[in-house]
Design a protein with these regions (language model features):
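Active-site pre-lysine segment of PLP-dependent enzymes
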Residues: 172, 196-208, 220-246
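Non-catalytic terminal extensions of PLP-dependent enzymes
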Residues: 1-79, 83-87, 354-512
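Active-site C-terminal subdomain of aminotransferase-like
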Residues: 229-349, 353-356
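Conserved beta-loop-alpha segment that forms the PLP phosphate-binding cup at the N-terminus of a helix
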Residues: 79-82, 86, 102-130, 144-148
């Protein structure tokens, strides 16, 4: 829900407010968010349910919040902690002294998207002679690869995945490689379905073509090695695989650090070098940036360092075991309900399911689960793959697994009783005829009003939250998701850009 009346006075008060008042305002705003603890949110946050860990991370963050990563010589504490985080990630992912990848190096970034953008940049800039570079990715690859291609003006060649295995065919990826290809990417695991791509085969075809191979392990790559140690059949995906040149892994996911920390690893320093940006042709300080940002708060880095130190290898092994058992329990709950089926057998920390023929409307089911306190992530249909429900499973879910099965069965029953969502005839006709180019601001406002998104486009007001789309979102999103599901991907993108643009309007505050 969006309730801008809570910030009706604006962020900049005339004379300042007391510290406890400002903090109380933040807490009131946070009360409208999804719950970040308690094991009922299956996306966005990663909660290990370890007592005291939040307090430790917050204290470490506070110690380094105002330290600037712009200059590692001025603040050597950050350099030391970054190097330690890179070393830990490298070890977990098959690199370091005594391995077949002894020269692994890396950088700490703000998140998986930045890591992927930099992996693409390093591959592109390693070949300045290629004037029209390209990258090859499976259709299941994270959308951040498309973002990187867009930002860096690199062509994106997308190879479909099998509707049965949800994985790409290495031969199809090989066929997509051209003389201009600078990078081939794969996932371990994929975000949408939680399956591990055939990394060894993909890395081999990339190596045969003389092309870099990046493994996107941002999502569950930290956990996979621990699952293997627990006896799970995790295929090789890391630096033990010949031909893998870089790997990304998010510490703010299953390393359970607070948000804002990912690691991009390269097999050696020569592969990493094109990632850097340096500039001295101006009268100010000589700029050298290993990552995209220049100024970087040390808070997230210190919090991640403290988290890894506190949990330790044994702690992560224990959390992986707890999560594995939770995944198994949730998968069993899905199997037990008529009308649902697993879209993929769980291989990592994801449960992904869809409806069978005659099953419930998935988007109505998501709303029914939300009404029962379970916050799941709907995924739209795509290229022969059905709409699905995604569950990111963390250790905090384990105590709740027994509650999920009965609630899932009740939600399915309620979704059947409600019946599928039917788009109003005028909306269905509009979506069928609409193209991204034909989407006007007036059409967007009309769609927003018809879908119950905000207030549908009243004129911007005085900051009391009455700008276009500034009102609360609908309690049930099935109609919105149904409309998006009916639209082709290009139209979905444009619609979402416009809808979010309606939500993001400044709060001006009062003139008092």
């Amino acid at each position: 829900m969006i309730d801008e009346s809570r910030v009706a006075g604006g962020a900049l008060s005339p004379d300042g407010v007391a510290a406890d008042v400002a903090l109380a305002e933040v807490r009131r705003l946070r009360a409208g968010d999804r719950p970040t603890h308690g094991g009922r949110l299956f996306a966005y946050v990663y909660d290990p349910a370890v007592p005291g860990l939040d307090e430790l991370a917050a204290a470490a963050h506070r110690e380094s919040a105002h330290v600037n990563g712009l200059d590692p010589t001025a603040f050597p504490s950050l350099l030391a902690m970054e190097n330690a985080l890179v070393g830990a990630a490298g070890r977990v992912l098959g690199g370091g002294p005594g391995t077949t990848a002894p020269d692994v190096v890396g950088s700490v970034t703000s998140g998986g998207t930045e890591s992927l953008i930099l992996a693409v940049k390093a591959a592109r800039d390693a070949h300045p002679e290629i004037t029209a570079p390209r990258i090859v990715v499976p259709s299941s690859a994270h959308a951040a690869f498309a973002k990187a291609a867009h930002y860096l003006r690199v062509a994106l060649d997308v190879v479909p995945v099998s509707v049965d295995t949800l994985r790409p065919d290495p031969a199809a990826l090989a066929a997509a490689i051209r003389p201009e290809t600078v990078l081939v990417a794969c996932s371990a695991p994929s975000y949408a379905h939680g399956v591990v791509d055939p990394v060894a085969e993909i890395a081999a075809v990339a190596a045969d073509a003389g092309v870099r191979c990046h493994v996107d392990a941002c999502f569950g790559g930290w956990t996979l090695p621990y699952l293997r140690r627990l006896g799970e059949p995790v295929p090789a995906f890391d630096f033990t695989v010949p031909g893998v040149t870089s790997i990304s892994v998010d510490l703010h996911k299953y390393a359970y650090a607070p948000k804002g920390v990912s690691v991009l690893l390269h097999r050696d320093a020569a592969l990493r070098a094109p990632q850097y940006f340096a500039y001295a042709d101006w009268p100010g300080y000589t700029m050298i940036n290993p990552v995209i940002a220049s100024t970087r708060s040390g808070g997230p880095i210190a919090a991640a360092y403290a988290t890894l130190r506190h949990l330790g290898d044994a702690g992560y092994l224990r959390l992986a075991a707890v999560t594995r058992d939770a995944v198994a329990g949730l998968a069993d709950a899905v199997r037990a309900v008529d009308g649902l089926r697993l879209l993929a057998e769980p291989e990592s920390t994801v449960v992904c399911f869809t409806a069978t023929e005659g099953g419930p409307d998935l988007f109505v089911l998501v709303d029914e689960l939300t009404a029962r306190g379970w916050h799941t992530q709907p995924q739209l249909s795509y290229a022969g793959l059905p709409a699905s429900v995604h569950l990111t499973v963390t250790a905090s879910v384990a105590p709740r697994v027994a509650e999920f099965g009965p609630d899932l069965a009740a939600a399915v029953e309620a979704a059947h009783a409600a019946g599928p969502v039917r788009l109003p005839a005028e909306l269905a006709a509009l979506v069928g005829a609409l193209t991204p180019e034909a989407l006007t601001p007036d059409l967007v406002v009309g769609l927003a009003a018809g879908l119950g998104l905000g207030d549908g486009g009243s004129d911007a007001g005085d900051g009391g939250g009455d700008g276009p789309g500034a009102g609360p979102l609908p309690e049930r999103m099935a109609l919105v998701n149904t409309l998006l599901d009916a639209a082709p991907p290009a139209l979905r993108e444009r619609l979402l850009v416009e809808f979010v643009g309606l939500l993001q309007r400044p709060t001006w505050g009062s003139d008092d």
